[in-house]
């Protein structure tokens, strides 16, 4: 099972939007996954395989052992689908 987090800077609002888009993309891959949300300050205490976040926050996550995937536009389903498929393929 792949442990995945959607991370935003201030709380759960934008990460909930990203989580919804990620769920669509992950379901299309057929991967076995667990998807949660976190804010940037709390992610370092989580065990994760993949972290999806914005470019601004990705710079703060250099110390994570998880692979960080940058999403430029949380509303762009195609970008999320493509980057999710690429990230999940690394676990196959």
Question: PLM features: what roles do these ranges have?
Answer:
Residues 2, 67-92:
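Ser/Thr/Gly-rich flexible loops in soluble cytosolic domains mediating phosphotransfer, phosphorylation
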Residues 2-39:
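Conserved active-site segments centered on acidic
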Residues 13, 59-60:
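Short glycine-rich, flexible loops that bind phosphorylated cofactors or substrates
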Residues 35-36, 48-54:
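Short, hydrophobic beta-strand segments that form beta-sheet elements in well-ordered domains
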Residues 40, 53-59:
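Short, polar loop motifs at secondary-structure junctions
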Residues 42-44:
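Structural alpha-helical scaffold elements that stabilize or flank donor/cofactor-binding regions
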Residues 46-47, 64-65:
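Short, structured coil segments at secondary-structure junctions
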